[in-house]
């Protein structure tokens, strides 16, 4: 997971980590974790912080070393990227910005050059994604469709 980070990201994370490793022993306390992550532009909730700490702090001693921290940040960034990509994709389909993708909007995008789908295929896509049966796809339905592989 951490091997997907760039050298620049690793350097940035090391700098932030070092700022909070007050005694220079290579560990930060769980209390400091939230501050570190916020300094890097992440905004985890208390619950998310606790989950991350529990996942990473294998020996339960309440501290996190740098390799564990890198793994955790790589996971957090991957999740954020995915969410943003899905949100951007939703906006592409939701032409009128009303929070729903209608069959007409989907048809417009999917019948552009390179995507040639028939009306039947477009209707089938809507039916598969349309969990509440209202004939269009809302954001939650879109997320489910995009993440269920």
UniProtKB/Swiss-Prot annotation:
Transmembrane segments: none
Residue positions where N6,N6,N6-trimethyllysine is found in the record: 116
GO cellular component, one term: cytoplasm
Residues engaged in binding Ca(2+) 2: 57, 59, 61, 63, 68
Endpoints of the signal sequence: none
Gene3D superfamilies xref list: EF-hand
GO BP annotations listed: microtubule cytoskeleton organization
Binding site for Ca(2+) 1: 21, 23, 25, 27, 32
Function recorded in the entry: Calmodulin mediates the control of a large number of enzymes, ion channels and other proteins by Ca(2+). Among the enzymes to be stimulated by the calmodulin-Ca(2+) complex are a number of protein kinases and phosphatases.
Protein name, UniProt field: Calmodulin-2
Organism taxonomic ancestry: Eukaryota, Metazoa, Chordata, Cephalochordata, Leptocardii
